[in-house]
Amino acid sequence: MEGAAPPASSGSEVTGAGSGKVDAGGGAAMEERFADLCKSKLGLDESITRQAMQLFKESKSILLSSMSSLGSGSPEEIERFWSAFVLYCVSRLGKAGKGKEDGGISLCQILRAFSLNIVDFFKEMPQFCIKVGSVLAGLYGSDWEKRLELKELQANVVHLSLLSRYYKRAYQELFLLNDAKPPENSAEPNAQASDYYRFGWLLFLVLRIQTFSRFKDLVTSTNGLVSVLAVLIVHIPVRLRNFNIKESSSFAKKSDKGVNLIASLCEKYHTSEDELSKAIEKTNTLIVDILKKKPCPAASECQQDRLSFIDPEGLTYFKNLLEEDSLKLSLLMLEKEYENAINTKGELDERMFANDEDSLLGSGSLSGGAINLPGTKRKYDVMASPAKSITSPSPMSPPRFCASPTGNGYCSSKMAPITPVSTAMTTAKWLRSTISPLPSKPSGELLRFFSACDKDVTDDITRRAGIILGAIFTSSSFGERICTSVRSTNRIDAIWTEQRKMEALKLYYRVLESMCRAETQILSGNNLTSLLSNERFHRCMIACSAELVLATHKTVTMMFPAVLEKTGITAFDLSKVIESFVRHEDTLPRELKRHLNSLEERLLESMAWEKGSSMYNSLIVARPTLSAEINRLGLLAEPMPSLDAIAAHHNISLEGLPPLPFQKQEHSPDKDEVRSPKRACTERRNVLVDNNSFRSPVKDTLKSKLPPLQSAFLSPTRPNPAAGGELCAETGIGVFLSKIAKLAAIRIRGLCERLQLSQQVLERVYSLVQQIIIQQTALFFNRHIDQIILCSIYGVAKISQLALTFKEIIFGYRKQSQCKPQVFRSVYVHWASRSRNGKTGEDHVDIITFYNEVFIPTVKPLLVELGSGTSPNKKNEEKCAADGPYPESPRLSRFPNLPDMSPKKVSAAHNVYVSPLRTSKMDTLLSPSSKSYYACVGESTHAFQSPSKDLKVINNRLNSGKKVSGRLNFDVVSDLVVARSLSDQNSASAAATTADIATKTPVKLEQPDC
């Protein structure tokens, strides 16, 4: 079939680069340039230069074959990227000296030497690691990725970027940046107001390194930053204040002695008084030790003007700390201290974040895919969750960033904007106020559930929780990367780790009790043996609780999926409990629900398909025809490690934990189940959640009254008597694949909308992907769902005779929120011995090669079947629309019902409606001429105007009492209308046919921005 033929020009369509081939002479020239740069420009010593040259030579062949896979695709830029990556790997993994005096090199030096910025570096580095992973493993060992700490450093950069913006906004709110009234009696040249700003940021950086260890969580770092603000308020001259301490609403907490500064800052920045007091104490200690300043015995007597109307309780005043004659010296001392601290392997100079114009910062976002920062997605993304229960019932969530002319994300409103840092602090407040006060042991009601089982499971559950949480929250996980000389850091890390462990334990018991309570109401009985004795279920619950605690504090060294490795479960296991966990914790903040939503998407889109996923242990039972391919690729999961093995591996002390019984209860561990997916299972299961979402795409109906969690943790081969003889594996895989289909529908809708494709094309793409899920499931093995979607869109475009290139599809995909360049640059393939290209074994290729060599040979029959109903001209399309599909063509699957996009009324007293912002309208808003027609919550509709003014105007209009002569009719805006109008929202004519829309609205070919 011609329509299914591969594109004529493959690789160039995706990357836009040239042929991508460089001869051997060019490779030799690259080596010479790299060696010269190491010696002359960077001045590296012989040892590190030798190691760098070795890695460059061994990876040169990969570089020469990948000349279109990095950056813009130009050979010169790719060479710069590759050289920078080589040097960074050597600096982190090599045996060279760690400091500058030993010939070491920092990341900042590398970036400046190759004219790169930090954003581009982290966006392209994963592609380098994928391609050169085998070389790095051969040179530096199999643990090279862990030692490289790339994800940790990237998350650290994201945190510093957020904290610098947070500090800048707070400083500008509290102090003047320019001194309009310098002191008249000063003989010294007036200290620049910006020097105080620099002092605060440097003090924070030194505090963060010396006291909090190098990779610390966002909440602890924010507490340290607020402590620095407290020091600045006490010491910066009063003339530079932007507030009146007596009248400011920001300092409303007062005592008999004046304003309670610590309590006021805690209320303003959502910190804990106890934690802030400790942070201030650490900051004061640092000032004494490093700046050699002595605190005044009585703070209120040392500086009357700066401490007037302020309660000195808990505060320390240092004489001459920020006076003009000592400020410069204090800055120099902090600079020296910081430089000494960062002169280690591959460190980043974090001082650059205080300078918005630093060329190393670059532009763009680093948060996507690396770490999940709260507040970076709109409500629509939450509504589009494959699990309905994760969505919030509230009508609309405001954007987390306010737009400003400078693009820094700050509002000029007096009301503090909602930022990732403020959201993290608010979420931490929930953990502190709701979870921390709970007991660290099971409640009386929960103990009754435990004892009501066939065998009392109390000891088993408490012992398991102690071991698993001990493995997750070990001091080595958070404190092993310390690069300071402060001896108390280990003790501080141990205290912090124990606090987080207790929070996770309390949350686990709380949600488990809620689940048990709901279960007994359904069953009218307290015997929950089958649920409470399941090892894998409890590990998933503990992992989910720990992940929420880690996500709340935004830890850097224990980012997801670290909890999976620590607990011995897989992504597929965790996906079974997310929906129920959210459903049974009513107080869970919206940001944590969003976090779980994003995790579920990551699990579904790729992680559950990775090698070693327990999904394959069920799939091999549910689909025996796939067993040969699963075994050929070695995809089956390893047995889940025992609790004793986990305790021994992490050196967990079992003191205080219940002893392990000599004989395991017959219902409890999944030991046998993990070793063999065909284990006979005798447990019975209870009803936990509604079964409406538990529909298999293979079965027309699922007669089982059992919900997903009911059979989720059973043996895959156990028959489900309530499901018409269907095996538990079939039930579980059916649920999983139905979620995959829904996620695919959401992604297809978003991308087809951006590409302005017709509804007919959209439904064909969805039908094709659905058929691939059912009939060619192996295409997803070890791959990303977006890779299948991209190829499906191109294949359908070919059979529909649309003038749509792969480059245009990739350009549109780059603008999607879930875009990751490695999705289309590195697709997993396992060449069979009979492959026509002569290659064998595992490999990673670009999306075009995958489309030509793997996708089309596999999917061509489905495309032929789908394309047999394609009309060649407008007349036939009109006939098809009127008469339905041709008899010989399969009936297209109707596009599934997706979350409601209708406007929602947000006020009972006024006719005010809010609707989610669609992708196409978001693009329209980028036009200044069109932007004024829309009002976005939290985003100004006019340049240099704060959102508060917009809202004030709206309120004035609503409260003016002036009657509107006409009514807005929202009745026509329904799910059906929205689903059918995805492709023509920006169309000039409502009467245009779907073929006209598909062929007359080409994608603009611009420089990709992702």
UniProtKB/Swiss-Prot annotation:
Domain of life of the organism in this record? Eukaryota
Region called Disordered, residue ranges: 1-23, 657-679, 868-898
Q: Where is this region: Pocket?
A: 419-861
Q: Does the keyword Zinc apply?
A: no
* Record Pfam families: DUF3452, RB_A, RB_B
Gene Ontology CC: chromatin; nucleus; transcription regulator complex
Q: Which UniProt keywords apply?
A: Cell cycle, Nucleus, Repressor, Transcription, Transcription regulation
* Location of region: Domain A: 419-619
Q: What does this protein do?
A: Regulator of biological processes that recruits a histone deacetylase to control gene transcription. May play a role in the entry into mitosis, negatively regulating the cell proliferation. Formation of stable complexes with geminiviridae replication-associated proteins may create a cellular environment which favors viral DNA replication.
Hey, which family's this protein in?
Belongs to the retinoblastoma protein (RB) family.
Q: What is this protein called?
A: Retinoblastoma-related protein 1
Q: Which organism is it from?
A: Oryza sativa subsp. japonica (Rice)
